């Protein structure tokens, strides 16, 4: 008899805080169908547990999330991956409890969408960030639903268009993070203590206020961003970009 598969997202509750830990280091916590399903289940469990006041989203290993699982990118329905990502981000935004990202590693592409969907976000000195889509023949379409309502426009343009890596201090400056910290545990604790003092109703209704613009963006642009992502993933340039990435070589257009 086969042993049950190890969870890709671990769920733990302590002192009114549910911690969801992305735990698939073999593929850098890439957004596979299985990982996203477990993430959404964890969020649903936290939503229905009256003892949970807030959720922390964190990771094992040196990568918070590498973005899409490229091994699944061309299987079946081309809209499946972006639709899955949009659903996961929206589940975070719509959860009637604050979600706090705790990052101390690399965040790429779709992983930035998860951070952007969170209400608060803290990253440590090992945090690095990059919108790598532009170097793969893609665009950060789906993740923009959660990110563009929150980011400084000039900062978004710089990092979206260059695909370059930036650190936690810059991520805080452009509005991706609440705090860039030397010690994420120390930075997180006063935030969580404050959330524990707040009423469940107060948190839910206040979160509804501060996420209203983000949710309007999801409702207005969600389907078009899914369609754009699917179209780009199926393009010749994106196929070359992803092939080059997997083969660890420059794409044909790189100068």
Please identify what each model-predicted range represents.
Residues 144-154:
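Hydrophobic, secondary-structure "cap" segments at the distal end of domains
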Residues 20, 24, 39, 57, ...:
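Terminal peptide-recognition signature
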Residues 122-127, 177-223, 230-231, 236, ...:
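C-terminal long alpha-helix characteristic of the crotonase
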Residues 110-121, 125-126, 143-144, 168-170, ...:
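Active-site-proximal glycine-rich helix-loop-beta segment
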Residues 1-60, 189:
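Conserved CoA-thioester-binding segment of acyl-CoA-metabolizing enzymes
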Residues 51, 59-91, 107, 217:
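Glycine- (often His-adjacent) and acidic-residue-rich active-site loop
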Residues 66-68, 155-164:
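Short helix- or helix-capping micro-motifs
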Residues 91-136:
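Glycine-rich beta-to-alpha active-site loop
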